[in-house]
Amino acid sequence: MKPIPAAPEPLGQHQDSPRRKDKGEAESERQRTRERLEATLAGLAELGHLRHRQEVLIKSVLSPGTRTHGDAAARTGDNPRSLEEKFLEDNILLLKKQLNCLRKRDAGLLSQLHELDKQINDLRIDVEKTEEHLETDSRPSSGFYELSDGTSGSLSNSSNSVFSECLSSCHSSTCFCNPLETSLNLTDGQAKSADDFLEWLDYRESQHETGTVRRSFSAPHSNSVDIEADVHPKYQCDLVSKNGNDIYRYPSPLHAVAVQSPMFLLSVMGNIKAEEPEEGIDHNDNDDCIVPELDHLKDEDSFLHQSSLCSLPLSSAKKMDGYILSIIQKKAHPVRTNKPRTSVNADPGKGILRHGSMCVKQTGGVSQSNAVNLKNSKQTCLHSTGMIAVDNSTYPSLKQCSKESLSEQLESKRMPSISTYPSCNVNELQSQNNSRNTVKSVCQGLARGSVAMTSNVQKENVTPNALANLSNTSSSVCNVTPGESMQNSPLLPQEIKVVPPVKRVSPQNTLLSYHASSSFDERPPLDFKSEGSSSQSLDEGLLVNAHYIPAQQQGVKLHKHTKYVKIVKSSTLKHRANVQYVAENGSQTLKEKSKVVGKKCRFPDDLDTNKKVKKSTLRVKKTAHPHFEPAVVGRNPVAVRSGSKSHGHSKDVVLAKPKHKRGDYRRWKSSAEISYEEALRRARRRAQGEMVGVYAQVPFPYSSPYAYIASDSEYSAECESLFHSTVVDTSEDEQSNYTTNCFGDSESSLSEVEFVGESTTSSDTDESGGLIWSQFVQTLPMQATATAELQTTAKAFVKIKASHNLKKKILRFRSGSLKLMTTV
């Protein structure tokens, strides 16, 4: 039965042993505190005794008898006595200073006694706390609570605030005697507060118990006696601001708070080791801070150590920043300067024009002889492949590019540079861009107005070899001056040369039509006008001809759909000359062109969504080529030449904005004005004796603004995407050109109608170039004005395949002979 009662005894002992242990530690703490206070009082008494003794010595020295005795001794050569007196005088001065310090310290000692009483009470309350909890407390390691918290009751607050001035003065004057100096310089050779004196007393009396004392004093409200020996050295060093101008000495009331501020250099350097505040607590002082009493070598070593510690993360951070910046620069859009940045080398990856919506790559076959200067090299890069990849997202930036290229080509107009390029590059690019790859070189070549050529353009039946010839032609023609036009003519295809007789050109092997009048017109080049347009409007820049070819039936195969637009009669399509317009408005020509440069082009994507299906419809207006018979050519050579000149203008692709996006469109004309203008035009045509089925040249005052680059007509380039319609009107007779417009993939009665280019023109030639819709749907009763001149035939009803928007516009001007059939 004995083991049974023995079992609860160890359990009770285990329960009571922590309490007894804690009580024992509390008692020992109180005992050590009492002994420390007694030692302090003993030290004060000793100082008082020393003071009294020194006073006696001073009085004895200063008495008259002693002075005379001293003088006599000095005369007799009692040197040891005189030296002793000097030593005593020095001690007296030191003791006076020490007394002043002790007077100030008395108040501090009283406050320290109160603090010790509070800590003893705290120890009695927190007896049941374990050592692990006290050790893992993170507040002492922060250096804030024990050094700067004014309400925490810590010793360091009072000591730093009360004794900082005293200790700094005492240390500078070395007022303490040897035992006190050893106590105050125990930690790092620097003068400390009265807490160091207490620590020294404790260290002298009980060295073996200092560990527990420090651990117990590292409670939430601990004094700085233990902290002074164990804290991180950065809390005991001088503060140097980052700019190096301000230096704060160590004993200052706000030192602990300032150390934690990022404004100071030492806190930044100390952060490297601040990750482990409790493990690395006993680092040397020369690792992280500057102690005034240490060696200069140690200071330099500490600074080198700190700089080496800080340089590693700084260099890695710089490398990381550079890497991030390089990635950002690669991904970011390039800064678009005024001039396009081109390269003259033959590397295809480097010769990219990174400007706006243009991307012209330079192939390996580029001849380097053209790179005479920067401007010629830019033109070489532009014409090297004859390809333009139009970016639909950045087309508003073309305004600046077009202005820049305009001025560049004006300067390089007199610098001929002829180059030919292999055709394999064009074949490679044709699969990407279909037939959009020649407009830029065509427009620039025509803008020179210097090479006289003629040809017919078959728009869609383009073979790779034909595209190769086209690129050769465009690149060799763009920089040719008038004097060199006949010398360079062997570079051109056979059918492009200028011959006096009219030759019949087959539409299958003709690609391009260059023409210019022999009277050279000083017109600035207009090359970047159509850069932002769609593929349909880009293609139409090629559909201009110079000579009239007899009528023939021809089919145009479209890109995206396999429909054919059959053209039976193309003998009545008529292009007007604008030679008179250029002569009359010669001073306004440059003004008009500079204004048109600023007009932005609209892509088909900007239009309504119900018209996107109609993107494939290409205009047949310019495919129906006007023709002259040899008799007419011989009879009116000036008119032929002026006609060729006017069609050179119409080669520049004219783009149109939708009406709701343009602010300068014109008003609708009244029916009286339309009737008067139409009757006047018919009277002029009949006065010139036009023949059946043959286009006569229109007199000079009626030049077409839609064949001119300054026109901004909605019908000139983007009509198929705006309206997508086929307007077929009846003619009054065979001689009347009062006929139709055919646009797109019409499946209505095209085989019964005639093509008239006049209905797409307007006699109004002001700069705004807006659309007058009534001139395109000329179905108003104009017969009343011209009844005497026109032969009347039976009226036939017309079927119009129109969209909803077109129907609304036609309904405003409908007549009795118009039947609307809306198919969309």
UniProtKB/Swiss-Prot annotation:
Region Interaction with tcf7l1-A: what ranges?
Answer: 2-343
- Cystine crosslinks: none
Expression across tissues is: Expressed both in the dorsal lip in early gastrula and throughout the posterior presumptive ectoderm in early neurula. Expressed in the dorsal neural folds at the tailbud stage and highly expressed in the tadpole head, including the brain, retina and cartilaginous branchial arch derivatives.
TM spans, by residue?
none
| Compositionally biased tracts (Basic and acidic residues) | 16-33, 520-530
Task: Give the main localization category.
Answer: cytoplasm
Record InterPro entries: Dapper
Find motif (PDZ-binding) and give its ranges: 821-824
Chain residue ranges for the region called Disordered: 1-33, 131-150, 515-534
Q: What does this protein do?
A: Involved in regulation of intracellular signaling pathways during development. Specifically thought to play a role in canonical and/or non-canonical Wnt signaling pathways through interaction with DSH (Dishevelled) family proteins. Binds to dvl2 to regulate the degradation of beta-catenin (ctnnb1-A and possibly ctnnb1-B), thereby modulating the transcriptional activation of target genes of the Wnt signaling pathway. Seems to promote beta-catenin degradation if not phosphorylated and to block beta-catenin degradation if phosphorylated by CaMK1D.
Q: How does it assemble?
A: Interacts with dbf4 and tcf7l1-A. Interacts with dvl2/dsh; the interaction is required for dact1-b phosphorylation by CaMK1D and seems to become disrupted by the phosphorylation.
Q: What does the comment on domains in this protein's record state? A: The C-terminal PDZ-binding motif may mediate interaction with the PDZ domains of DSH (Dishevelled) family proteins.
> Could you identify this protein by its name?
Dapper 1-B
Q: What is the native source organism of this protein?
A: Xenopus laevis
